[in-house]
Each structure stands twice: as C-alpha cells, then as structure tokens.
C-alpha cells in the first residue's frame, strides 16, 4: 500500500482472553490496539486489565440474572406464538400448543392475565371463535375446540415465556457450551427496573478499570423462533421485528396510553406475523412507537449511571437492539457515546456511519469462533479465516472510502488465531490500512458524482441502508443488492418514504430508485394509492430527473396499469387480464456500458411495452429485462431484477449516470470494473482499491491527469497527487 506515512496505533479493539495474556498483549501491539475487550464466554485477567489499554466490558442487561429470573418467572420476556393450522374432521378438535416449537426456548404462559389475550381462529373463514367454544387443559398443554365446523382449519394464538435468551442459545449450541441456560428478564415491569438500576450501579462499582461499557444492546432481541424439527430449526426470524417485546403488562400499559386494545392477532397476523418486509399498519407503528419510547426512557437511566461513574456508554447495533432505533429522532436522547455494528457487508458500514453518535465502530468478520454463522469451518480444520477476512474486507473497504468510521475490531476467542499466523498478519495489514483511510476523512468528504440518489420505500430513513438483518438473511430481495452496490459508489444517497415526497424531498435529489415485489414495504404497497405521490414523481421525471424501477416497482392492483409509474417506465406487467391483448414487438438495442457481465436481470413473465416507445436495452427469451423510456426531459429505467457483484456495481453506476443524462466516461471513475477509487479533494489524495483476487491494472483521471497503477489482489494504493 503506497502512502505518505504509516499509522500503526489506535482505532482498534482487540478481544482479550484470560489464560492467554502473552498472546493478547503481543497481538495488541502488532494490531495497534488501544482498547482490549471481553467477549461472550471470555474474561480479562488482571495482567490484561493493568496493561495500560482502554477496557471495553460487555454487558447484556437482560440476561445473566438467572437467580432473580427464577424467583420472578412472571417477569421473563414473552412472545405470542401460533400453532400450525390443523384441519378438523369432526365437531371437536384437540390442538397441542407446543407441537413443533423448541421447548428449551418457550414455556406456555397460562396465567390469568395471559389467557385473556389467547385467541382461537377458524382460518378457513378468518373468524374468531368465542371463548365458550374452546377450553385449555394445562396438564398436557392442549386446547380443545367444540362445536366447530368439520373440514375447517384452526389455529391457537397463545402467550409464551422465552426461557433461553436467543443469542446465548445460538452461541451455546454453536460452541457446544456446557453451562446453565440464560433466561431474559423484561424491564417493562417496575420490579425489574428497580433490580436493573441497582445491578447497574453495583456493576460500575465493581469494574473500576472499565473505560467503556458496551451495551449488548438494550432490552429486546430481534425475533428468532426456533422449532423442534432440525429440518426447519428457525421457524421465524426477522432482525427488525418487535414480536419479542410483548407481554400482558406491556399490552395493558399500551391500552392506557393509546386508548385501544391490541390483540394476539395484531401480532400473529394470520400466522404470517408482521415482517419488516411488508408495510406496517397503524397498530404496528403505534406499538413500535410505544416500545421505542419505553426503551429510550428507561435506557437513559442506565446510561446516566454509567456516565456518573466516569465511563463511556456504547451500544451494539445488533442482538437485543429492538426499540433502540438508531435512525429515529429519539436516539440521541439515550446519550450513548458510541455505536458498534457487526459487519459482513458494505451496506452495514454505511448503516453504522450514518448514526448520530460520537464514535462509530465496526466489529469485523470472521468472528474468532470455530465455525461461522452458516456452520462452515472458520478457525478449525478446513477453515480459511484469512481468505474469509479478505473477502469481507473488500466489501467493507469500498464503503469505508465513502463515509468515515472511527474504530474497527474483532470479537471471540483470541487463542483460536494461534494456528493461523497468516490471519494475524492480514489483520495487522488491514488495521494499518483502516487507520490511513480514517485519517483521509478528517480533511473532508471524497469527491461525489453529480446525481443525488433517493431510495424510496415505506420505511424511509428509519431503515436507511438495511432491510432486516445481514446480507445472507435478506439476499432474496433486490433492494439489499442495490444497497450493497450503492454503499461503495461515489454518489450521495438518502432513504425516503412516501410522506417525504409530499413534504418536498424530491427537490433535493436527481434519481429515485424503487425496488422490490408488489405489496412489499420496499415497493410501497398501498402507498401508491396516493395520487399526489404519482403527480409529484411524474412531474419530477418530466422536468429532467430519473426514476429507476426494479422487479415490480410501484405495483398496485386496481388501476389501469399494475405499475403506477408505468407511464414513466414505458413497461407494465400483466397479471392475466391483458392476455388477449396485442404486444409491441421490439429489437434489442444494447448499450455497451450497461451490459451485465454476470448475474444479469432475470426475465419476469408478462412484462410488456406500454406504447412501444421504450428502448429495450436487454431482453431474455423475447421478454424485456432492461428498458429505457424518455419521458419529457427525464428518463425512466426498468430492471427486471438486480444482483450485486463487483462487476454489477459498475453497471449500476452506469445505469444511474445514464438515467441522469450524465457521461459514462468522467473523472473519478476507474477504467477497470474490478477496481474503484475515491478522491479526497482537500488533501489531494487518491485511493485506488482492487476488489478482486488477482493483480489488476487500473487507470483513473483526476483534474485532467490520468494515473495508472498495478494493484495487487485485494490491495489498496494511496497516492498523494501534486
């Protein structure tokens, strides 16, 4: 890596481990750590604590309190569960509540206050059965239905305690731990709050050497329901779901504040639950607001205690983060000093960087565990953690060039690296590389190209950059691929919702992207009923801007076209009611810079040209998969799908430039699709990166002068320009 100076200290958090003091301090020196942390399952010895480093101590507020939890079972966290539909073959039916659920995670709550919220539904007619039609039998945890309709389907929605904290449960089963299962307590109860305030104060007294308290995270985990059948172990998982925040007491408090009663069905939603990928209704939004207000109000009291002891408070933007909402206006009320995000991908870097907090820190992958999240070997025989680290780093690095991050680090069991010296060498390299990139941002933002981008969906800025979880959890959605590509492209990007459009958000952007399937939160669903949205977007494009639609953009049934923006896109999708209508023929007119080298758009059946004027840039089996439509002075672009790759990121860049009427060949863009660059104008520093596993020659023009470099595999070149 070419550079003016080497920065070898600071901005790095190392996971220490008692019993491996020599290794801990040796790697702290090599990796330039200024902070040492503990991890789930590890401790720091006095030798480490007294070695002169800052100390991060990890706390999970709602677990590690088993003695108190066992004495206060009614204060455990809960959730609504729903049985699988069962078909009745007579007028009576017995349903086993826990069939299919992981019994080490859930325990039926059949208390009087919980039973008040249980519901039994006829799913054939979607009608609620009166309580006189069913009875609960606690001895075998079954519900017996009587006087029902044979051959109809029935479900029971009930409340259950969660008796094994999910993150600990995952770590326990992954690492073959042999220790007590940790329960999770619910601070919605006054008694729990009093206990936690006292515990937090005592904890701070006992941890004098801790400089930063790392909250993991606040109170409520993302939903992660496990099943008893290993063929379908994870029944339901949604990183941004609020399902694990419910309890009879919380529901009563909600009723008092909002003036109406929430039911089990408000959460169960026909067994579909309210996944983040679908637009939220008013009841869900009210519940989210209620929980967010509580988490902020009580969370601040705990953070104030930490501050009173002269310590900093950081929050981990994963695990039990639900209700924290770092992109909500309430977040700054917490008083957090920093935020830590676990990252696999570039979009997660941008997710972290955009939060209003003093310190932004990334927890890099791979974690120092024997196996990775997918169960593949990592720090064990058959694993290649160095290659894993390189592949993760090239995704992270391209986003790091666009927005500043203050710190990076690792987590897990440090002793596992002893058998992988090439891994320790590589971490030393990227730690130094990170520090240099961090320094470049101090002088100002890198150069950005002209089109300003707005990604339009139902959640808007609240879900900036993310959908619901990591890339491998949301890969089936076009938008996460778009976000990942955008994370390292030289554009200013913002995320807006439909109300933002009515408030004038289009005045600040040049290109709007809407991507996803019909009815999803990512395309907007019923939001497209608002004629003012249509009017504003139509005028926006007509007056010279661009609308890029991917998959089923603006789709909503009930109108003359399925795509509400079909008049701007020049294409629409037929659901069958136009099967007898004629279709315009066309000739493919490819544009070299817009061709996909790999993983191109996949054809969707029944896409047709609305008036025959759209230019078909790419077709597949006679179906348009990428089109361009001139509308007034602007342009609509349609893509049947989008999949992120290094090459495709360049194609997306070109599509955006083309949509905005900008040149493909301009300064600040490398000539090699495997490479990218960032130019920091104030310091006149050019950074060129190689996103491939082979040597690449790359050229880029800055201020009229072209610079050409050979960049080794995975590597970075930093050039001071005269």
UniProtKB/Swiss-Prot annotation:
Gene3D superfamilies according to UniProt: 3.40.50.880, Glycosidases, Immunoglobulins
Keyword check for Phosphoprotein: no
GO molecular function, one term: 1,4-alpha-oligoglucan phosphorylase activity
Keywords for this protein: Carbohydrate metabolism, Glycosyltransferase, Rhamnose metabolism, Transferase
Record carries keyword Transferase: yes
Root EC class: transferase
Catalytic activity: beta-D-galactosyl-(1->4)-L-rhamnose + phosphate = alpha-D-galactose 1-phosphate + L-rhamnopyranose
Enzyme Commission code: 2.4.1.247
Gene Ontology biological-process annotations: rhamnose metabolic process
Active-site residues, Swiss-Prot/TrEMBL: 319
Family named by the database record: Belongs to the glycoside hydrolase 112 family.
Role summary: Reversibly phosphorolyzes beta-D-galactosyl-(1->4)-L-rhamnose to form alpha-D-galactose 1-phosphate and L-rhamnose. Does not phosphorolyze galacto-N-biose or lacto-N-biose. In the reverse reaction, has the highest activity toward L-rhamnose, also has activity toward L-mannose, and low activity toward L-lyxose, D-glucose, 2-deoxy-D-glucose and D-galactose.
Protein name (Swiss-Prot/TrEMBL): D-galactosyl-beta-1->4-L-rhamnose phosphorylase
């Amino acid at each position: 890596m070419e550079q003016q100076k080497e920065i070898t200290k600071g901005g790095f958090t190392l996971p220490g481990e008692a019993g491996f003091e020599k290794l801990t301090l040796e790697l702290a020196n090599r990796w330039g750590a200024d902070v040492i942390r503990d991890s789930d399952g590890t401790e720091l010895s006095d030798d480490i604590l007294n070695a002169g480093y800052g100390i991060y101590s990890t706390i999970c507020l709602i677990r590690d309190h088993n003695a108190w939890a066992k004495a206060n079972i009614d204060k455990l966290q809960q959730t609504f569960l729903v049985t699988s539909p069962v078909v009745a073959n007579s007028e009576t039916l017995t349903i086993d509540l826990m069939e299919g659920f992981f019994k080490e995670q859930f325990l039926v709550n059949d208390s009087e206050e919980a039973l008040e919220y249980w519901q039994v539904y006829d799913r054939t007619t979607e009608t609620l059965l009166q309580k006189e039609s069913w009875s609960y039998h606690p001895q075998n945890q079954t519900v017996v239905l009587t006087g029902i309709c044979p051959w109809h389907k029935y479900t029971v929605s009930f409340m259950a305690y969660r008796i094994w904290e999910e993150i600990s449960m995952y770590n326990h089963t992954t690492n073959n731990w042999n220790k007590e299962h940790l329960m999770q307590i619910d601070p919605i109860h006054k008694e729990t709050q009093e206990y936690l305030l006292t515990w937090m104060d005592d904890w701070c007294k006992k941890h004098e050497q801790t400089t930063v308290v790392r909250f993991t995270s606040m109170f409520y985990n993302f939903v992660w329901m496990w099943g008893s059948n290993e063929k379908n172990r994870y029944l339901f998982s949604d990183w941004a779901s609020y399902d694990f925040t419910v309890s009879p007491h919380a529901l009563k408090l909600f009723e008092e504040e909002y003036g109406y009663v929430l039911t089990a069905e408000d959460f169960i939603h026909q067994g579909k639950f309210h996944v983040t990928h679908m637009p939220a209704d008013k009841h869900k939004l009210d519940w989210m607001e209620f929980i967010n207000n509580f988490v902020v109000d009580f969370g601040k009291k705990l953070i104030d205690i930490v501050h009173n002891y002269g310590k900093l408070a950081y929050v981990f933007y994963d695990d039990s983060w639900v209700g924290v909402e770092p992109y909500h206006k309430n977040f700054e009320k917490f008083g957090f000093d920093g935020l830590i995000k676990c990252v696999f991908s570039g979009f997660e870097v941008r997710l972290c960087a955009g939060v209003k907090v003093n310190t932004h820190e990334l927890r890099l992958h791979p974690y120092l565990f024997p196996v990775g999240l997918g169960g593949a070997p990592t720090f064990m025989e058959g694993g290649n953690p160095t290659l894993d680290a390189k592949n993760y780093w090239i995704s992270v690095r391209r986003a790091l060039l666009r927005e500043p991050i203050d710190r990076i680090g690792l987590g897990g069991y440090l002793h596992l690296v002893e058998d992988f010296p090439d891994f320790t060498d590589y971490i030393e390299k990227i730690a130094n590389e990170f520090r240099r990139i961090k320094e470049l941002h101090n002088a100002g933002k890198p150069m950005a190209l002209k089109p300003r981008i707005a990604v339009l969906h139902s959640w808007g800025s609240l879900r900036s950059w993310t959908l619901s979880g990591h890339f491998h959890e949301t890969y089936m959605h076009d938008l996460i691929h778009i976000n990942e590509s955008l994370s390292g492209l030289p554009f200013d990007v913002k995320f807006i919702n439909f109300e933002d459009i009515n408030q004038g958000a289009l005045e600040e952007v040049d290109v709007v992207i809407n991507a996803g399937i019909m009815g999803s939160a990512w395309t907007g669903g019923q939001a497209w009923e608002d004629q003012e949205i249509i009017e504003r977007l139509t005028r926006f494009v007509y007056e010279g801007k661009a609308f890029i639609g991917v998959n089923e953009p603006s789709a909503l049934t009930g109108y003359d076209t399925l795509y509400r923006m079909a008049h701007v896109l020049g294409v629409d999708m037929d659901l069958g009611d136009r099967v007898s209508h004629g279709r315009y023929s066309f000739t493919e007119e490819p544009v070299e810079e817009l061709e996909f080298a790999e993983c191109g758009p996949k054809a969707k059946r029944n896409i047709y040209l609305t008036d025959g004027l759209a230019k078909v840039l790419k077709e597949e089996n006679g179906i348009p998969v990428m089109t361009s439509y001139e509308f007034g002075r602007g342009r609509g672009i349609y893509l049947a799908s989008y999949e992120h790759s290094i090459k495709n990121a360049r194609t997306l860049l070109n599509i955006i430039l083309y949509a905005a009427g900008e040149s493909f060949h301009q300064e600040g863009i490398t000539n090699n699709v495997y490479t990218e660059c960032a130019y920091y104008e104030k310091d006149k520093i050019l950074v060129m990166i190689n996103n491939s596993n082979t040597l690449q020659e790359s050229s880029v023009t800055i201020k009229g002068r072209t610079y050409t470099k050979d960049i080794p595999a995975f590597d970075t070149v930093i050039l001071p320009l005269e």
